[in-house]
From Swiss-Prot:
Homodimer. It catalyses: (2-aminoethyl)phosphonate + pyruvate = phosphonoacetaldehyde + L-alanine. Involved in phosphonate degradation. Its EC number is 2.6.1.37. It is an enzyme of class 2 (transferase). One of its GO terms (biological process) is organic phosphonate catabolic process. Belongs to the class-V pyridoxal-phosphate-dependent aminotransferase family. PhnW subfamily. Disulfide bonds: none annotated. This is 2-aminoethylphosphonate--pyruvate transaminase. InterPro entries: Aminotrans_V_dom, NH2EtPonate_pyrv_transaminase, PyrdxlP-dep_Trfase, PyrdxlP-dep_Trfase_major, PyrdxlP-dep_Trfase_small, SP_NH2Trfase/AEP_transaminase. The gene is phnW.
Length: 367
C-alpha cells in the first residue's frame, strides 16, 4: 500500500476532490434526524430533480456497488409472469443476462456484439414478434468499449409498445444531460462513484413511483428488495433498512454540492467531452488508434488498440505510467487487444495534457 495519490483514469472508482474525501471525516449515527432527514432525504430529492422536472418519480438508495442495484431492479420489477428483453453489447449487458438467468427471470438476450451499436430496427422486430416481453433493459454508457447506446430511440420503442423500461446509467448519470421522463425511463440505475464523483459504497435507483409501488412482494432477495428499501426510506424519513454506509453518503452529499458549483450536469458534460476529445487527438498523434469510430464514443471512457510491436506489454506500460502518477484500465473486449482510458472524475484539461506527456515517456517499445 502506498500513500501516493494517483490520478485514476478509470470509469469509477475515480479521482475525487479533496473536499469530498474530507466529508468522510465525520461520524454519523444512522438513527439521527440530522443524518436521515438532513442528508439522506436531501440526496433523494436532489437525485430526482437531476433526473427530471416531471412529477411522479422517486429515488431509493441501496448499499453496495452498482451491480447490486441492477440486480435489485431486475429481481423486484419483474413478476413471475413477466419477461425482459435485455439489449447487450458489452460486459454489463451480459451481466444483466447472467442475473436474469440466476434469478429464473424469463428473458430474451439481444446480443449485437461488443463493438456494434444496438440495431433499433432489430429491437423493434423482437418486440413485434414476442408480445410476452413486458420489460426492456439496457446499458446507456457501456464502459467495456466506451460506447454510448441509443437509449432515446429504444425508449421511444418502449413507450410505443407499452413496455417497462430499465436503464443502467451507471457511467452516464450526472455526466450526460438527460430527462428520464422524456426518455420514457421507468427505472434508472446509477452509482455514487461515477459521474457525480463520490466514493464507492452505495448505488441508487430513480423510478416512476407508480411502477415501484407495484413491486411489493416480488423481490427474489431480502437485502435487494427494492420496494422494501424504498418503503423504509419513505416511512422513516431516510432510514435505511440495514446499516447505512454513512461516510460514503456524506461524501456523496458533498459531491452533489460540487456538481452544482461546477454548473450542473451540462457543464460537467462539457468538461468530460473536452477531456475525451483532447485525449483522442493526443493519442492519435502518438500513433494509437481507437477501438470505436468517433460517432460511437461516449465522453466517459475510450478504448485504444494495443500497439502491435512485439515488445509491447500492457503490464509494463501500466507500470511506467503509474510511476508517473497515472492509472489506466486494461481492456475488457474479448475479441480485441486493447486498453482503456477514462476521463471522468476530478480530471481537467491540464491533467489530460500531463497524461499525454507521461504516455509519450512510457512508450518504451518505440525507444
Amino acid at each position: 500500500m502506498t500513500s501516493r495519490n494517483y490520478l485514476l483514469l478509470t470509469p469509477g472508482p475515480l479521482t475525487t476532490s479533496r473536499t469530498v474525501k474530507e466529508a468522510m471525516l465525520f461520524d454519523s449515527c444512522t438513527w439521527d434526524d440530522d443524518y436521515n432527514i438532513g442528508v439522506v432525504e436531501q440526496i433523494r430529492q436532489q437525485l430526482t430533480e437531476l433526473a427530471t422536472a416531471s412529477e411522479g418519480y422517486t429515488s431509493v438508495l441501496l448499499q453496495g456497488s452498482g451491480s447490486y442495484a441492477v440486480e435489485a431492479v431486475l429481481g423486484s420489477a419483474l413478476g413471475p409472469q413477466d419477461k425482459v428483453l435485455i439489449v447487450s453489447n458489452g460486459a454489463y449487458g451480459a451481466r444483466m443476462v447472467e442475473m436474469a438467468g440466476l434469478m429464473g427471470i424469463a428473458h430474451h438476450a439481444y446480443d449485437c456484439g461488443e463493438v456494434a451499436r444496438p440495431d433499433v430496427q432489430a429491437i423493434d422486430a423482437i418486440l413485434n414478434a414476442d408480445p410476452t416481453i413486458s420489460h426492456i433493459a439496457m446499458v446507456h454508457s457501456e464502459t467495456t468499449t466506451g460506447m454510448l447506446n441509443p437509449i432515446d430511440e429504444v425508449g421511444a420503442l418502449a413507450h410505443r409498445y407499452g413496455k417497462t423500461y430499465i436503464v443502467d446509467a451507471m457511467s452516464s448519470f450526472g455526466g450526460i444531460p438527460m430527462d428520464i421522463a422524456a426518455l420514457h425511463i421507468d427505472y434508472l440505475i446509477s452509482s455514487a462513484n461515477k459521474c457525480i464523483q463520490g466514493v464507492p459504497g452505495f448505488a441508487f435507483v430513480i423510478a416512476r413511483e407508480q411502477k415501484l409501488a407495484a413491486c411489493k412482494g416480488r423481490s427474489r432477495s431480502l437485502s435487494l428488495d427494492l420496494y422494501a428499501q424504498w418503503r423504509c426510506m419513505e416511512d422513516n424519513h431516510g432510514k435505511w433498512r440495514f446499516t447505512s454506509p454513512t461516510h460514503t453518503v456524506l461524501a456523496f452529499a458533498q459531491a452533489l454540492k460540487e456538481l452544482a458549483k461546477e454548473g450542473g450536469v451540462a457543464a460537467r458534460h462539457q468538461r468530460y467531452q473536452q477531456n475525451q476529445r483532447s485525449l483522442v487527438a493526443g493519442m492519435r498523434a502518438l500513433g494509437f488508434n481507437t477501438l470505436l469510430d468517433d460517432e460511437l464514443h461516449s465522453p466517459i471512457i475510450t478504448a485504444f488498440y494495443s500497439p502491435e510491436d512485439p515488445q509491447y506489454r500492457f503490464s509494463e506500460f501500466y507500470r511506467r505510467l503509474k510511476e508517473q502518477g497515472f492509472v489506466i484500465y486494461p481492456g475488457k473486449v474479448s475479441q480485441s487487444d486493447c486498453f482503456r482510458i477514462g476521463n471522468i472524475g476530478e480530471v481537467y484539461a491540464a491533467d489530460i495534457t500531463a497524461l499525454l506527456t507521461a504516455i509519450r515517456t512510457a512508450m518504451y517499445w518505440t525507444k
